[in-house]
Amino acid sequence: MGAFLDKPKMEKHNAQGQGNGLRYGLSSMQGWRVEMEDAHTAVIGLPSGLETWSFFAVYDGHAGSQVAKYCCEHLLDHITNNQDFKGSAGAPSVENVKNGIRTGFLEIDEHMRVMSEKKHGADRSGSTAVGVLISPQHTYFINCGDSRGLLCRNRKVYFFTQDHKPSNPLEKERIQNAGGSVMIQRVNGSLAVSRALGDFDYKCVHGKGPTEQLVSPEPEVHDIERSEEDDQFIILACDGIWDVMGNEELCDFVRSRLEVTDDLEKVCNEVVDTCLYKGSRDNMSVILICFPNAPKVSPEAVKKEEELDKYLESRVEEIIKKQGEGVPDLVHVMRTLASENIPSLPPGGELASKRNVIEAVYNRLNPYKNDDTDSTSTDDMW
């Protein structure tokens, strides 16, 4: 569940890179949570003859960050170094890759269990994992838990991973077969995901294999043939993002941002901020991977964006002036704007994605405001 801070930590960790015809950016932010338990991996060019392959993943830790941190450093090695992945001589086949990914997950989970037992079970943390392994011909989506990945192809959501929730019929059946129950949509009324790495308290049912436990470390793997013409971008994100934005919303929002900037870190920062302002209370991490045919910056879109920002600035000034005596608080300004039909707001992001612009104008016009009223708080914002 996790405890919350009095105000969100909005400092971000960023990275970006390019290679193998891909560009990526990432952003992660602690937000309202007391701890930062997310982790991520981004590797372009893999060792051992896989220089044209790339790997990206987001890990959403719970009950501590140890498992997420260990996976972000070691999961890729466990996947690419097992015999199932390597197969016989030459490049691994599609089946080799899929089997190798599954084996890698089971191996790292068992390895972490042994380490945990040596420490007398001191680590009770767990982590989801969502990732993509991109070869020259295929994109392999990998999912274990309720983080999510999606592929935008030809301006639409073409594929997205399915969240592993305890209430899903197949997941529920496995949990019940292992002697557990699903209460308040949680495993034994406690854990909100039905598949994860770590969480060894839920993996000790005697007579059941590793994939038959209350919580399973088995990933779902989907291979998608790459389309140079139509593939645009991939988004990997933890549930702190998906809790407040749907697949189509996020796809539309990212596409609209790519038309106004080619800075992928900036796009990811906008996603994270927008989700905070839409009410997400969780840690947030997002990786954006762009294929060669991703949307390009359009002068028309840039002009439209500048006009929107100017319009919002003038409206904030008008709202403050209209108040007469005393300056209205930021919540009042946001609510007033939310009640209006403002043209050309970014799709998917809507007014929340312009909160930084609105706040900057508000602060400029009201430099002596009391800091207590400065709410990055999203409580009761609208």
From Swiss-Prot:
Keywords: Cytoplasm, Hydrolase, Lipoprotein, Magnesium, Manganese, Membrane, Metal-binding, Myristate, Nucleus, Phosphoprotein, Protein phosphatase
GO terms under biological process: N-terminal protein myristoylation; negative regulation of canonical NF-kappaB signal transduction; negative regulation of non-canonical NF-kappaB signal transduction; positive regulation of canonical NF-kappaB signal transduction; positive regulation of canonical Wnt signaling pathway; protein dephosphorylation; regulation of canonical NF-kappaB signal transduction
TM annotation in the entry: none
Membrane topology qualifier: Lipid-anchor
Residues given in the record as Mn(2+) 1 binding sites: 60-61
Cellular component aspect of the GO annotation: cytosol; membrane; nucleus
SUPFAM superfamilies membership: PP2C-like (SSF81606), Protein serine/threonine phosphatase 2C, C-terminal domain (SSF81601)
Cofactor: Mg(2+); Mn(2+)
Catalysis performed (reactions): O-phospho-L-seryl-[protein] + H2O = L-seryl-[protein] + phosphate; O-phospho-L-threonyl-[protein] + H2O = L-threonyl-[protein] + phosphate
Family: Belongs to the PP2C family.
Protein name: Protein phosphatase 1A
Lineage: Eukaryota, Metazoa, Chordata, Craniata, Vertebrata
Gene (UniProt): PPM1A
